[in-house]
């Protein structure tokens, strides 16, 4: 029986990406309960501008209390993702949670966006989320039969049809909304199985390398919240009853508020009550 105080103890999560940033924080939060974590990530060696590798992430997960399977692979590679799923089931006995975290971003206008980058965003964001979710469905159904509360959680925004989001960055919007449509469709398709399928998106920009490395990034970084707010919100979603919590597009601070957490000062990069940057698509 699960520990009521550590509901993810012994549960198994498979995540795309996770070498750093929001994904790693989500994995660490689950590891604090004693969860098993598989990371599918490409960063095997240190990157010149991005901190962390799959190996340093694995060390942090183990230090937090979790068991980790580090799978160096690309979510664009069907065979590699299939092997990661198979090895996860072999190592940990099943899969209870899928977190679609891997994402590529280029906010260029249509005329400036190369088709190579367009394809990369489609392949990682939309197709990668569909592929990992699809390959995990049999294991998630087995988890549901065993009453282990399975979930799919995708880091993608609400389907906001305000034209300014498509008009400003069409290629990226298509890729991220493809992830969100995957949530919408799988939630309905898997509803009868009792598998929770949801998306999570931050209210504000999150202090990650992707923010810091952009032009003007230092100021935006200072006006952001830390990745821990997404991790705490993800934890609350993943520990909720999947059969009753599905088809939602959650915003991180809304999730916390629903659980009585309204003092968010600890999540600020810069203490105080100064302005925060709103995230995209809201």
Residue ranges and their predicted role:
Residues 1-92, 105-106:
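Short-chain dehydrogenase/reductase
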Residues 141-192, 201-205:
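Catalytic loop of short-chain dehydrogenase/reductase
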Residues 133-134, 184:
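A short, exposed helix-loop element centered on a Lys and neighboring polar residues
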Residues 199-200, 218-282:
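C-terminal helical subdomain
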Residues 109-110, 114-120:
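Substrate-binding pocket helix/loop in short-chain dehydrogenase/reductase
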Residues 30, 94-96, 180-184, 190-202, ...:
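Conserved Rossmann-fold SDR core element
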Residues 108, 163-164, 195, 203-215:
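Short beta-loop-alpha junction of Rossmann-like oxidoreductase domains
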């Amino acid at each position: 029986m699960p520990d009521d105080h550590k509901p993810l103890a012994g549960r198994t999560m498979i995540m795309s990406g996770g070498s750093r940033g929001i994904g790693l924080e989500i994995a660490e939060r689950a590891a604090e309960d004693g969860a098993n974590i598989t990371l599918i990530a490409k960063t095997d060696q240190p990157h010149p501008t991005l901190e962390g590798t799959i190996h340093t992430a694995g060390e942090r997960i183990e230090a937090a209390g979790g068991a980790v399977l580090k799978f160096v692979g690309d979510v664009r590679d069907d065979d590699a993702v299939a092997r990661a799923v198979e090895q996860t089931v072999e190592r940990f006995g099943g899969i209870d949670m899928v977190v679609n975290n891997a994402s590529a971003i280029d906010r260029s206008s249509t005329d400036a966006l190369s088709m190579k980058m367009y394809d990369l965003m489609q392949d990682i964001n939309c197709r990668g989320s569909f592929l990992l979710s699809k390959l995990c469905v049999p294991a998630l159904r087995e988890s549901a039969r065993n009453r282990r509360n399975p979930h799919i959680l995708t880091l993608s925004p609400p389907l906001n049809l305000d034209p300014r989001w498509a008009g400003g960055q069409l290629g990226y919007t298509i890729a991220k909304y493809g992830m969100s449509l995957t949530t919408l469709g799988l939630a309905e398709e898997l509803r009868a199985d009792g598998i929770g399928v949801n998306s999570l998106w931050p209210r504000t920009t999150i202090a990650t390398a992707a923010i810091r490395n952009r032009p003007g990034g230092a100021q935006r970084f200072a006006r952001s919240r830390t990745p821990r707010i997404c991790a705490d919100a993800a934890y609350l979603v993943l520990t909720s009853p999947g059969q009753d919590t599905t088809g939602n597009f959650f915003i991180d601070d809304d999730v916390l508020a629903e659980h009585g957490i309204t003092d968010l000062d600890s999540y600020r990069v810069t203490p105080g009550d100064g302005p925060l940057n709103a995230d995209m698509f809201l």
